[in-house]
Amino acid sequence: MSLKLPEHVAIIMDGNGRWARQRGLPRVAGHYRGAEVAEDIIEYCIELGIKHLTLFAFSTENWNRPKEEVKALFELMENYIRSKREKLYSLGVRVRLIGRRDRLSRGLVNLMEELESDSKDFKNLFLNVAIDYGGRDDILRAVKKIMEVQPSKLDEETFSQFLDLSCSPDPDLLIRTAGEKRISNFLLWNLAYTELYFTDTLWPDFTREEFMKALEDYSRRKRKFGRVLDE
């Protein structure tokens, strides 16, 4: 039986801190290893023909973490963009930043906007990177933008166009690593009919083989979207 692949995969990359702690390393070491794993999964998605990938890199709640860790995370993001953007271009990856931009450093926003502009014509993979993102905040910002629309013209399709993920279809599959079984305020509107897959594997240990397990599990599911399917 051929594998039925999702068009859009979203991933909550959890477990970096636990991975580092288990090895007696600083938490930031887990984040650096996690970035390497993300890079490999990006390449694997292209090889498989998956067209959309959304990675949850930093939530609106992550500001509550220790200041030194937050600082190190943003330094990692900036360093990663500078060192990897040419590779992303060569792979044909179009990158989009989703989430709030007003609380990010000007340097990081400038880098991300350059990446968005330079990659806008690439089509091998549409990569959405969620930084300072929260599902409730996304919906609230959409409501503020849509208040000028006449109520009679407002429907689900129109509302979706005001959300951060408007340029990608809703995720078909959400993967969360590290054993937690919740969506943690991620893409609340967009996950309405998304298939959920949870694994105990920590994100820094997440391999192509683990990713394929999730895809195989997804392929066996029958998506109903509220309908009754014949058995």
From Swiss-Prot:
Cofactor: Mg(2+)
Entry note: cofactor: Binds 2 magnesium ions per subunit.
E.C. no: 2.5.1.-
An annotated GO BP: polyprenol biosynthetic process
One Pfam family hit: Prenyltransf
Top-rank lineage group of the source organism: Bacteria
Gene3D superfamilies on file: Decaprenyl diphosphate synthase-like (3.40.1180.10)
Active site (UniProt): 14, 62
Signal sequence coordinates: none
One of the record's GO molecular function terms: magnesium ion binding
Alphabetized UniProt keyword annotations: Magnesium, Metal-binding, Transferase
Residues holding substrate: 15-19, 27, 31, 59-61, 63, 65, 176, 182-184
CDD domains named among the record's database cross-references: Cis_IPPS
Binding-site residues for Mg(2+), renumbered to this chain: 14, 195
Quaternary state and interactors: Homodimer.
Family per record: Belongs to the UPP synthase family.
NCBIfam families per UniProt: uppS
Function statement: Catalyzes the condensation of isopentenyl diphosphate (IPP) with allylic pyrophosphates generating different type of terpenoids.
Name of the protein described by the UniProt record: Isoprenyl transferase
Species per Swiss-Prot/TrEMBL record: Aquifex aeolicus (strain VF5)
